[in-house]
């Protein structure tokens, strides 16, 4: 999900291809597909669907949980309201934003709410960054990742409400469902009862599950968690220096707890194993899930993210006078003599100027595009430790409806796979009563990112054979593959390893008029969709607070954001 830049004329052809391949949110270039010739029935079906009118859906899954009265939701709502109620600027700032993922979209949305005029530039021809998706020749969508919207995402939930699209979230029953590797084809559930408040509903879910953890293991795990419960956020942040495995050993938590629960959780949160993941990441998730009644409740988007989530944000931005441009890749950050930003130079030769600039693309791209005069500034130097993690998203269309699955997210507990879902069940736009489409996160992916798609599919099928022993075999003697798509993201969210927290930057940089947005920037939700949206709000807040300074700053003083050919 990340990309790189700082391109010179000499290496432009190579760099452009490299950038495209690593473009934020993964890229279509890296998403290859394969079709079995006998899929005419599938082609006929999808052609009919692709010629239909606009998607018409009404959410009829589990009713939307009552989130509006939670402390975190109200806090997020207050921050959103502060932009709408901010004094209208005498002359709106023209803010140029690079990157139309959730962080860039959020930044532009809230700046527009505050009365300013964002110009949002996206390098590719698709919105969404890490939630980008593409439609194939049959009209079927394939995505950068398997995206889950938690009740514990207050800023994301507010965003849906502000856009009037709450009905586009398909809420699932309040459960976490894990495959049982020792019992192929079987699952174990953690069911959270609605009648109990937090944290009792979470405690009840853990205590009632006797298939994954024994009572002595549960007790030792609970004792190990006591310092986090008592110490609060300060304790959580102090654990950044320990990996999950190190923390568990330090707290005397049995190793089997890590094996049974936290390998799956680590891979789901950051695509890496618990011997690498910072314990802070796990504790933040547990904190939200245990303190909020509906925190761990999950929802799927009812269709593809670019159309069902990103476009409503774009429509909102444009309705308030902002602009959004695709196919506008940053080649260079050009500086004034005093080291401030003069313009963004695009790969098409155009320059874009404004009153303020936001870099909302992933951290790996920023590091490649960072101007030489900035590289030794501590604020930017610390970014060296922040590196995107590779991940692979796999989509497989089968010739039949698989039975051993649920209308929910499933934790595979496989060595190669993380979470997966039968999207023909969980998502209205992808619904199919006759055939299953499994979307699977292949992680950790570092050793596989350079392998061929056929290698990845072969390995995936061997894992699926364990999850569907009666329905899938690796040699396809049972369910047959009609087609597949493999989307490789060489650099996704930043790798949340120990001691990263001090390296995460504030949204306001030391360069006057230059700001950052992205889940790697400082906010409490780490690498997530919620973190991206919140970072955009913090970035917008910084710009609104700096209005007088930006309005009075030298040659950029309230200039129109311009795009000029060079």
UniProtKB/Swiss-Prot annotation:
Entry keywords, A to Z: Carotenoid biosynthesis, Chloroplast, Chromoplast, FAD, Flavoprotein, Membrane, Oxidoreductase, Plastid, Transit peptide
Reactions the enzyme catalyzes: 2 a plastoquinone + 15-cis-phytoene = 9,9',15-tri-cis-zeta-carotene + 2 a plastoquinol
Entry binding sites for FAD: 103, 122-123, 130, 147-148, 153, 330, 519, 529
Primary localization class, coarse: plastid
GO CC term, one of those recorded: chloroplast envelope
Pathway where it operates: Carotenoid biosynthesis; lycopene biosynthesis
GO biological process: carotenoid biosynthetic process
Signal sequence bounds: none
Domain of life of the source: Eukaryota
Topology relative to the membrane: Peripheral membrane protein
GO molecular function, one term: phytoene dehydrogenase activity
Transit peptide: 1-86
Subunit structure: Homotetramer.
Name of the protein: 15-cis-phytoene desaturase, chloroplastic/chromoplastic
Provenance organism: Arabidopsis thaliana (Mouse-ear cress)
The encoding gene: PDS
């Amino acid at each position: 999900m990340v990309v790189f830049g700082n391109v010179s004329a000499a290496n432009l052809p190579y760099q452009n291809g490299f950038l495209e391949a690593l473009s934020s949110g993964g890229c279509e270039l890296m998403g290859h597909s394969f079709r079995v010739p006998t899929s005419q029935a599938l082609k006929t079906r999808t052609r009919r669907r692709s010629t239909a009118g606009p998607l018409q859906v009404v959410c009829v899954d589990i009713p939307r949980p009552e989130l509006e009265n939670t402390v975190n939701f109200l806090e997020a709502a207050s921050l959103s309201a502060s932009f709408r109620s901010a004094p209208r600027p005498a002359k709106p700032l023209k803010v140029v934003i690079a990157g139309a993922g959730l962080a860039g979209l959020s930044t532009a949305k809230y700046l527009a709410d505050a009365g300013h005029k964002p110009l949002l530039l996206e390098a590719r021809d698709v919105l969404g960054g890490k939630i980008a998706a593409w439609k194939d020749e049959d009209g079927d969508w394939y995505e950068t990742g398997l995206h889950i919207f938690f009740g514990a995402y207050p800023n994301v939930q507010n965003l849906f409400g502000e856009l009037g699209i709450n009905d586009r979230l398909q809420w699932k029953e309040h459960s976490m469902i894990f495959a049982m590797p020792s019992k192929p084809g079987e699952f174990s559930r953690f069911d959270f009862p609605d009648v109990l408040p937090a944290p009792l509903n979470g405690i009840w879910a853990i205590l009632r599950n006797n298939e994954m953890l024994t009572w002595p293991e549960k007790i030792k795990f609970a004792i190990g968690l006591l310092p986090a419960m008592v110490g609060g956020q300060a304790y959580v942040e102090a654990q950044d220096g320990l990996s999950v495995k190190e923390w568990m050993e330090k707290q005397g938590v049995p190793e089997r707890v890590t094996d049974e629960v936290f390998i799956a959780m680590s891979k789901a949160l950051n695509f890496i194993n618990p011997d690498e993941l910072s314990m802070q990441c796990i504790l933040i998730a547990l904190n939200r899930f245990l303190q909020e009644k509906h925190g761990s409740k999950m929802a799927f988007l009812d269709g593809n993210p670019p159309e069902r989530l990103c476009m409503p944000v774009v429509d909102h931005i444009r309705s308030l006078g902002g602009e959004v441009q695709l196919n506008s890749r940053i080649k260079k950050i050009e500086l004034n003599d005093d080291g401030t930003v003069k313009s963004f130079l695009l790969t098409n030769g155009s320059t874009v100027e404004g009153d303020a600039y936001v870099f909302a693309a992933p951290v790996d791209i920023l590091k490649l595009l960072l101007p030489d005069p900035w590289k030794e500034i501590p604020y930017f130097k610390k970014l060296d430790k922040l590196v995107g993690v590779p991940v692979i998203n796999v989509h497989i269309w089968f010739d039949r409806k698989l039975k051993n699955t649920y209308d929910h997210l499933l934790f595979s507990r496989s060595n190669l796979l993380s979470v997966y879902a039968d999207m023909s069940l969980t998502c209205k736009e992808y619904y199919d009563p006759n055939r299953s489409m499994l979307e699977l996160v292949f992680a950790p992916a570092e050793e596989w990112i350079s392998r061929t798609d056929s290698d990845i599919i072969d390995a995936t099928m061997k894992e699926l054979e364990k999850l569907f022993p009666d329905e899938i075999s690796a040699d396809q003697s049972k369910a047959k593959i009609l087609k597949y798509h493999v989307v490789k993201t060489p650099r996704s969210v930043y790798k949340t390893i120990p001691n990263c927290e001090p390296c995460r930057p504030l949204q306001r940089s030391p360069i006057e008029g230059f700001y950052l947005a992205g889940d790697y920037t400082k906010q409490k939700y780490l690498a997530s969709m919620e973190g991206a949206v919140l970072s955009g709000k913090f970035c917008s807040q910084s710009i609104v607070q700096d209005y007088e300074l930006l309005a009075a700053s030298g040659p950029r003083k309230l200039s129109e954001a311009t795009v000029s050919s060079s």
